[in-house]
């Protein structure tokens, strides 16, 4: 049995868009191969071999995306579920010592974008806030010690 792949709705849509783009690109690469194959000497036909390699990479990524979409467990949460932090939640944390705040959105491991504040729900911060309520104090174990935060806000 294949495990479900946790994913947000936006992550699912992003994969669908990438799949559509790759299918169009595959057609273009096949045409490049056909044109390059018109040069009868296949042993030293660099454009043909480059296009063939590119097609293999595209085919591999298409299969990977199709697998992810087939087994995706898309998390859909609405504003009525904002009492607890879940997949897709945006959570604002406040450090009780200095009052500094930081904001993170919990996503699947395949959707992480640290520079945009998108972190994995299975990361140390993600695990610490998951299924917690607004106002709760959390502790996060890091190599340098323990960090404490208060959940200031939860949104979707």
UniProtKB/Swiss-Prot annotation:
InterPro entries: GreA/GreB_C_sf, Tscrpt_elong_fac_GreA, Tscrpt_elong_fac_GreA/B, Tscrpt_elong_fac_GreA/B_C, Tscrpt_elong_fac_GreA/B_fam, Tscrpt_elong_fac_GreA/B_N, Tscrpt_elong_fac_GreA/B_N_sf. Keywords: Coiled coil, DNA-binding, Transcription, Transcription regulation. One of its GO terms (biological process) is regulation of DNA-templated transcription elongation. GO terms for molecular function: DNA binding; RNA polymerase binding. Residues 12-72 form a coiled coil. It comes from the Bacteria. Gene3D superfamilies: Transcription elongation factor, GreA/GreB, C-terminal domain, Transcription elongation factor, GreA/GreB, N-terminal domain. Necessary for efficient RNA polymerase transcription elongation past template-encoded arresting sites. The arresting sites in DNA have the property of trapping a certain fraction of elongating RNA polymerases that pass through, resulting in locked ternary complexes. Cleavage of the nascent transcript by cleavage factors such as GreA or GreB allows the resumption of elongation from the new 3'terminus. GreA releases sequences of 2 to 3 nucleotides. Belongs to the GreA/GreB family. This is Transcription elongation factor GreA. The gene is greA.
């Amino acid at each position: 049995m294949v495990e479900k792949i946790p994913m947000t709705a936006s992550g699912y849509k992003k994969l669908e868009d990438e799949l559509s783009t790759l299918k169009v690109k595959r057609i273009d690469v096949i045409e490049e191969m056909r044109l390059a194959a018109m040069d009868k000497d296949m042993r030293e036909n660099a454009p043909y071999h480059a296009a063939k390699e590119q097609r293999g990479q595209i085919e591999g990524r298409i299969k990977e995306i199709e697998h992810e979409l087939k087994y995706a467990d898309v998390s859909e949460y609405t504003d009525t579920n904002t009492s607890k932090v879940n997949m897709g939640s945006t959570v604002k944390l406040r450090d009780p010592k200095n009052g500094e705040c930081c904001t993170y959105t919990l996503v699947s491991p395949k959707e992480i974008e640290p520079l945009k504040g998108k972190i994995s729900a299975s990361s140390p911060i993600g695990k610490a806030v998951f299924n917690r309520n607004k106002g709760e104090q959390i502790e996060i174990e890091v190599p340098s010690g323990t960090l404490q935060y208060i959940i200031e806000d939860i949104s979707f």
